[in-house]
Amino acid sequence: MELSLSVRVAEQLSNKRNPAMSLETLAEIALSAGYKALCMRASQLGIQTPIDEVSQKRQWLESKGLEVSMVTGDFPIPENTNLAPNALKNIGPYLDLAEALGADLLRIGMKEEDDINWAQRACDEAAERSMRLAHQCHTASLFEKVSLSLEVIHKVNRENFGIIYEPANLVQCGEEYGKDAIKALAPHTFNVYLQNLKISTDGESISHTWNRGTIRFDQVTMWGGQGIDFPLIISILKETGYNGYLTLHQSATPPTPPEEFITKTSEYLSALL
C-alpha cells in the first residue's frame, strides 16, 4: 500500500469548489511528506478544465514523480447532489480527463435504482479504454450500507466497477466498518479513502443520511487517539491483500495548518504500514 493525498485537503469542508492553495503548492507539500500520488478533484482539475491545461499539469506532476491515483471529474459527485449520477449518462469527458491525467480510476455517484443501468453502460464504455469506475461508501447514496453496496455491485455486474472503502461515512450511517465490512467489500475495493470524525450530539458538522436521519459530528485528526480505529483498518486491509492506495481524504482540521496536517497524517499512517 502507498499513500495518496486527495486535493480535498485544500478545500473547505462545506465548500468543495474553491481550493485554498495551488496544485503546485499542494504537490510540493505532498512530495515532502512522502505521498506517492494525488487524488484529483474538480477544485483543481475537472471536466471544466481545458484538456491542454490538464495535460500540462500531468507532465509537471510526472516530472516530480507523482501519479494521479483517481479522478473525480465534477462538483456534483463530491457534493453528493441529485446531479451526481449525471456523469454516468455522459461518461466520455470524464474518461478523457482521467486519460489525460494518466489515471485509470474514476469516482462516480449513484442515487437510485435507475442509475444501475447507466452505470453498466458507463462501465462498458470505460472498459473499452481499460478504465474502472468506483463509488465511495457515502451517506445519502446507494452505498450507505455494506449490504446495499454489495447488492448494487452485483447488479451492475461489471469487472471494472467497484467501491472506494471509506469508514467515516459508514460510521455516520451506523454501519460496522471493521473486519466484517472490509472483508465483505475486499473483492470489489478499488481504492481506500481515510478521514476521521467523532459522532457528537453537539458536533459542529452536520451530515444527512437516509437510514439514520441527521447526524452531528466533529472532524478530528487521525493521530489524536479519537474516532476511527485506523490501526485495525490497516491490519485488516493487509490480511485481505489490499495493495492499492490509502488516500488521505479529509480537509485540514482546524487549528492545524494544512501543511502540518498533511505531514503528520503521513507520518501516522506510514508507521502503520
Identify the function of each model-found stretch.
Residues M1-A100, M131, R158, S266-L273:
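N-terminal pre-domain/capping segments
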Residues V9-E11, A37, V71, D124-G227:
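Acidic/histidine-rich catalytic cores of soluble enzymes
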Residues Q12-A20, R41-E53, P76-N86, M110-N117, ...:
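Acidic-and-aromatic substrate-binding clefts and catalytic sites of carbohydrate-active enzymes
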Residues L23-A30, V54-R58, I91-L95, I116-C123, ...:
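Generic structural signal for well-ordered alpha-helices
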Residues Y35, A100-A103, T189, Y242-N243:
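A structural motif
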Residues L97-D114, H135, L248:
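Active-site groove signature of glycoside hydrolases
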Residues M222, Q226, I233, L246:
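H/E-rich (His + Asp/Glu) clusters that bind or coordinate divalent metals
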Residues N243-S251:
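Conserved active-site loop/cleft motifs that coordinate metal ions or position small ligands
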